[in-house]
């Protein structure tokens, strides 16, 4: 299938003036970034934002992702099959304070989508993911069969100096049927409809990211 990287919406993010930003990091003017591209996002179901956060915030996420303890990811049925999904994960919670700051920013993005699209998002969740060399994730959708609780998916990447020879791209079939092929380079946020089919190509080096979902269901305690 022909890659359609050039059709992806690549946005060079203009950060809010530093003097007007709160001391807490990960603050982005989502409305300013997306308003004039919203119709295209609705048509394609895919949005790509580059240089999203301040460099120091990205460094903090990279550091936290390197010190946490990962566990083998499983499929929806709780089964571990590395031939299908080869990443190790760590769900973000209060023990990941930098990740929680990231999630706060994602909830601001969710609030934007609620206002602009009446998306009905009520909460978000995320986990760090590490793919060792030689592994990927086969074609799938983020909503298990028969469910639609995940509304919008987002993946934030933490990999410096990523090269085309490193593999590990995310492939997304957008709403027009075209395949988006996107490198997992640091400070890139890929946003897409949670019902779109996507996969992670085999990576040839360690690949770090934060997988994120904006959901319309209530949290189950």
Segments from the language model and where they lie:
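Catalytic core of non-heme Fe(II) oxygenases with the double-stranded beta-helix
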Residues: 92-202, 206-210, 214-221
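N-terminal amphipathic/basic-hydrophobic helices that include classical n-h-c signal peptides
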Residues: 1-15
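Extended interaction regions within the primary functional domain
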Residues: 9, 61-64, 121
């Amino acid at each position: 299938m022909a890659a359609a990287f050039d059709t992806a919406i690549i946005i060079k993010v203009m950060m809010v003036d530093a003097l007007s930003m709160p001391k807490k990091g990960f603050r982005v003017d989502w409305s300013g970034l997306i308003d004039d591209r919203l119709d295209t996002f609705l048509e394609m179901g895919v949005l790509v934002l580059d240089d999203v956060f301040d460099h120091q915030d990205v460094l903090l996420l990279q550091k936290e992702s390197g010190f946490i303890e990962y566990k083998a990811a499983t499929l929806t049925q709780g089964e571990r099959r590395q031939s299908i999904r080869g990443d190790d994960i760590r769900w973000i919670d209060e023990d990941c304070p930098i990740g929680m700051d990231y999630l706060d920013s994602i909830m601001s993005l969710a609030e934007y989508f609620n206002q602009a699209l009446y998306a009905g998002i009520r909460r978000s969740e995320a986990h760090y993911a590490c793919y060792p060399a030689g592994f990927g994730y086969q074609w799938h959708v983020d909503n298990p069969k028969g469910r639609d609780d995940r509304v919008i998916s987002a993946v934030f990447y933490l990999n410096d100096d990523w090269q085309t020879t490193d593999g590990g791209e995310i492939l997304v079939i957008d709403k027009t049927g075209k395949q988006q092929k996107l490198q997992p380079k640091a400070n890139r946020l890929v946003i897409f409809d949670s019902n779109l089919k996507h996969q992670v190509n085999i990576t040839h080096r360690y690949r770090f990211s934060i997988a994120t979902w904006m959901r319309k269901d209530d949290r189950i305690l």
